[in-house]
Design a protein with these regions (language model features):
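Surface/interface-facing alpha-helical segments and adjacent flexible terminal/loop regions used
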Residues: 1-174
Length: 174
């Protein structure tokens, strides 16, 4: 008799792989540095939000991937919660901070999905400039927009499972 008789769902297993790939893609060194994304807690959140949004945009393209999209979203927010706690945010403050992060994430997801769906590089660059760079006129925002559109196109041409590996996330050209 097995010690733990319950199996994890395939969506849960796949979500863990996807979250690992999203985390790795969001930590590319080419994203950070002078004139690029600030290497701060906020900057790291923004790169995670961008890559998490790209993953969800791809998953939402196939309704049968709904369970994976939900498992990924749950795991994504558990990771953010864990990160806040590791940074020393008190237990009583975490729910309020998570509410703000969730609101910020879903606002970004909506803006990025609309711009990517319309293949509107200017709108995406403006949203990325405003959210990620904190400056709509940022010189790096168009580069980040080109990158996000390239990643979205790359993922749209492949099965969703390709996102579970580093090859599913083309690197930002430095």
């Amino acid at each position: 008799m097995p010690i733990w008789p319950f199996r994890r769902s395939q969506a849960s297993v796949d979500s863990e792989l996807l979250l690992t790939a999203v985390t790795a893609a969001s930590r590319q060194s080419a994203l950070f540095g002078e004139g690029r994304v600030a290497d701060t807690l906020d900057g790291r959140f923004e790169t995670m939000a961008l890559h998490g949004a790209l993953a969800l945009i791809r998953l939402r393209a196939e309704p049968e991937l709904g369970p994976l999209a939900q498992a990924f979203t749950d795991d994504f927010f558990r990771l953010l919660d864990s990160g806040l706690r590791e940074e020393g945010v008190g237990d009583t403050s975490v729910p309020k901070r998570m509410h703000k992060l969730a609101s910020a994430f879903y606002g970004r997801l909506d803006a990025y999905a609309a711009a990517i769906g319309a293949r509107n590089n200017e709108a995406l660059a403006a949203a990325l400039g405003r959210n990620v760079m904190k400056d709509e006129a940022s010189a790096f925002a168009p580069t980040l927009s080109d990158y996000a559109l390239r990643v979205a196109a790359h993922q749209g041409e492949r099965p969703a499972s390709a996102m579970f590996t580093p090859e599913g996330w083309p690197a930002l050209q430095a």
